[in-house]
Every structure is written in structure tokens, then in C-alpha cells.
Amino acid sequence: PKYTIVDKETCIACGACGAAAPDIYDYDEDGIAYVTLDDNQGIVEVPDILIDDMMDAFEGCPTDSIKVADEPFDGDPNKFE
């Protein structure tokens, strides 16, 4: 399984992740990205059909704010750093 979360502290609201993976990432009122699957907690497995989109977003993030892991983040984007 794969999990994803956005580090809102480093996100610059560029819009790249939502363009790459609109079924996973959306934006708050300030344009800061978050994961829609679990309100950015990183605890819901990303469906297999969305893994390619997620990896495109992960690789395309200019600030490395998109985090991906094999275990849940439990709400902490820096859990595995």
C-alpha cells in the first residue's frame, strides 16, 4: 500500500499536484494543497488506479512538499524523514 500527505509548511500553492492527480490533491482557500482522501492525514491507502498520478505529483512538486510512504503518516508529513 501507498500513502500520501502534503507538507503544508513548504507548499507554495503552485497547483502542480492537483493538475497531475486531481483525484488525490485539492487546495484550501489559500491555494495550499491537501490530500482529499483523508483530509491530509496520510492514513488512507491510495487506490492502485491512482498510484501513477500520485507518483507524477510527487515527482513534479517543486518544493518536495508531496510525501509518499509505504506506511501511514498519522498526520505527520515528516514522520519518515
Swiss-Prot record:
Keywords from the UniProt entry: 4Fe-4S, Electron transport, Iron, Iron-sulfur, Metal-binding, Transport
Query: Where along the chain is [4Fe-4S] cluster bound?
Result: 11, 14, 17, 61
Cofactor: binding comment:
Binds 1 [4Fe-4S] cluster.
Taxonomic superkingdom: Bacteria
Q: Which cofactor does it need?
A: [4Fe-4S] cluster
Which residue ranges does the record assign to the 4Fe-4S ferredoxin-type domain? 2-30
Q: Where are the transmembrane segments?
A: none
UniProt cross-references to Pfam families, sorted A to Z: Fer4_13
State a single Gene Ontology molecular function: iron ion binding
Q: Where is the signal peptide?
A: none
Q: Which SUPFAM superfamilies match?
A: 4Fe-4S ferredoxins (SSF54862)
Task: Name the job this protein performs.
Answer: Ferredoxins are iron-sulfur proteins that transfer electrons in a wide variety of metabolic reactions.
* UniProt-recorded name of the protein: Ferredoxin
